[in-house]
A protein has these predicted regions:
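A residue-level signal for conserved active-site and pocket-lining positions in enzyme catalytic cores
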Residues: 90, 119, 195, 251, ...
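Active-site pocket-lining segments that scaffold enzyme catalytic pockets across diverse folds
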Residues: 161-249, 293-296, 300, 307, ...
């Protein structure tokens, strides 16, 4: 059942303020996009998959569940924002067998949830959908009681604010020393010079040890304020939460239209507008960064070509500026030859060279060998798909994995032939500043 609700309701606050200890939830917002948000709470059904075909298998499982889902005809609601009605919310690990270490237990290589309660909002429109799983032998009275119990727990409260105790200093420590990352970059550059590959993305992780359990709600709220142009997301299970702010769209599908973006090439921001503009101009003229951007955009175009009538990329990259960094980005659009499900499109594109490497076959085994870590869902995908197999997923970047009193932050850089290890390490430090000040 889908009903209109006041668009002034903070739907992420409603989800995070109403969660039970055993709940799963997901919030995805892009505040600058007319207050765009798709959020969900509880689990009427769960879809899981693993391995190289996890995107295809997850799409098939969602399709099978959709065939057994009886819903209001949201298509008749011309004002309903995208994401209205029953939706599957979740994401995918970076690697086919990712999220396999204890730190990531609670998530799977692919995991999507059909929420018991979901919200969609954009502009002046908002909708709430209630979904209930019906088993053989369930009584109508019992189903009604379950729905009422869930709705009675909903709270349209404000987000809690970050309020750190100044007397308590969390401990920040890299899971590996910075020199380990620099050595990994050096080895990657050697492989590139040897002709094994053009580019590889290497990540590192940093742990923040707090004095007590870390609540994701105020962190998500702070990210919404600091990064309103980004996809601000929070994925939660009873064991953990993943919270972040990503500047990168993986794919959006609306019928036969698809959109994505090639995002590669990064520099810092400056509080001085003149210096900030100069840094952006340098990035636009950088042969290294434009080459990195070209690798990503050309791969995306080649990937979408076989399933599209046409693919169109912007002639030149543009600057995307967020609070602490600025990137080169090339918007890409496609007219699909047939309505490929958004999850399958995501599987075709993932991992783009912006988070993996080029060629993928050479980068795939090199990344874990040099990084020595389980990326889990970092640099994977987070988002939603509806019963029509439309949807939207972002790349899970600039994120922290929260588990009890530890936050594990991730940051990575694209390594090409002229990469300098110290410069790449410095770039990861800049990217970590998206979340580190909120935790430390």
């Amino acid at each position: 059942m889908t009903v209109p609700i006041p668009s002034e309701i903070d739907v992420s606050a409603a989800v995070l303020g109403s969660r039970r200890a055993d709940d799963r939830w997901l919030c995805l917002e892009q505040p600058d996009r007319d207050g765009y948000a798709v959020c969900g709470l509880g689990a009427a059904a769960i879809v899981e998959a693993e391995g190289p075909r996890r995107f295809v298998e997850a799409a098939a499982a969602c399709r099978a569940l959709a065939a057994r889902t009886f819903a209001d005809d949201v298509g008749d609601d011309q004002h309903a924002p995208s994401g209205s009605g029953p939706v599957f919310l979740g994401g995918f690990a970076f690697a086919p067998d990712g999220a396999s270490t204890p730190a990531w237990s609670g998530l799977r290589p692919a995991q999507l949830v059909l929420p018991e309660v979901s919200f969609a909002r954009r502009g002046g429109e908002a909708r709430m959908t209630v979904t209930v799983a019906v088993e053989r032998g369930d009584s109508l009275a019992g189903l009604v009681d379950r729905v009422h119990a869930r709705l009675d727990e909903l709270r349209a409260a404000a987000m809690p604010m970050l309020d750190p105790d100044p007397a308590i200093r969390p401990r920040v420590a890299g899971a590996a020393p910075p020199s380990h990352y620099e050595e990994a970059v050096r080895r990657a550059v050697e492989r590139i010079h040897a002709g094994d590959l053009e580019k590889v993305v290497l990540a590192r992780e940093v742990d923040v040890h707090a004095a007590g359990p870390i609540d994701p709600a105020p962190i998500l709220d702070a990210l919404r304020g600091a990064f309103p142009a980004c996809y601000c997301y929070c994925v939660g299970t009873p064991e953990l939460a993943l919270v972040g702010a990503s500047p990168e769209l993986l794919v959006r599908r609306d019928g036969e239209r698809a959109q994505t973006v090639a995002l590669a090439g990064t520099t810092r921001r400056s509080a001085d507008p003149a210096v900030d503009d100069h840094l952006g101009e340098q990035l636009l003229r950088s042969d290294k960064d434009r080459g990195e951007q070209r690798i990503v955009s050309e791969r995306i175009e080649r990937t979408l070509g076989p399933v599209s009538l046409w693919v169109a990329a912007a002639d030149e990259p543009v600057l995307v500026k967020v609070q602490n960094v600025q990137h080169l980005a090339t918007p890409i659009r496609a007219q699909l030859a047939q309505p490929v499900p958004v999850l399958e499109l995501a599987g075709l594109l993932h991992p783009t060279p912006a988070v993996g490497g080029e060629p993928h076959a050479a980068a795939e085994p090199l990344i874990p060998a040099l990084e020595g870590l389980d990326r889990g869902w970092y640099s994977g995908a987070v988002g939603w798909t509806d019963l029509a197999e439309d949807g939207e997923l972002c790349v899970a970047l600039r994120c922290a994995l929260l588990r009890d009193d530890v936050a594990r932050l991730y940051a990575g850089c694209g390594i090409v032939a002229d990469s300098v290890p110290a410069d790449e390490l410095a770039e990861t430090e800049v990217k970590l500043q998206a979340l580190l000040p909120l935790l430390a």
